[in-house]
Amino acid sequence: MQATKTDVRTEEFMLDYLDNAVVGLHWVDGDAKILWANKADYEPLGYTEDEYVGHSITEFHADADVINDILERLLSGQSLYNYKARLLCKDGSTKSVLIASSGLFDDANNFVHTRCFTIQDPSTT
């Protein structure tokens, strides 16, 4: 089946939408490796795409117990809503965020990656 011009254009719009969204979006695999992230996920922390994507998400969390709990919950099939966390900025400061995330599982119920949305915690602004 060939992609039509409309299909290609729709895909371009969707990729632009995701990459330029005003909330942070990322996918993390079962080994905690960041597979993909949009600009709103890494730029507010002071990182470039190369400094962020491909690295372990644990490198960017200030509290090991928090990210370990997040990963454990997602790997077991739970979803998260407004989960508070502190992220590490490149300059050494931290940002308080709220995380909403769920896991993507394949037909054999194997974990594929997270579907994570990150916003700045409004109670800290």
Give the positions of each predicted feature:
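PAS-associated C-terminal cap
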Residues: 1-13, 119-125
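Sensory modules in modular signal-transduction proteins
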Residues: 7-30
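PAS-family sensory domains
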Residues: 29, 35-36, 61, 82
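PAS/LOV sensory domain surfaces, especially short acidic/polar patches at coil-to-helix junctions
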Residues: 31, 35, 39-43, 55
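A short beta-strand signature of PAS-family and PAS-like sensory folds
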Residues: 33, 84-86, 101
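PAS-family sensory/regulatory domains
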Residues: 39, 51-64
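Terminal output helix/cap of sensory domains in signal transduction proteins
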Residues: 63-93
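PAS-family sensory domains and close relatives that share small-molecule sensor folds
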Residues: 89-91, 100-106, 117-120
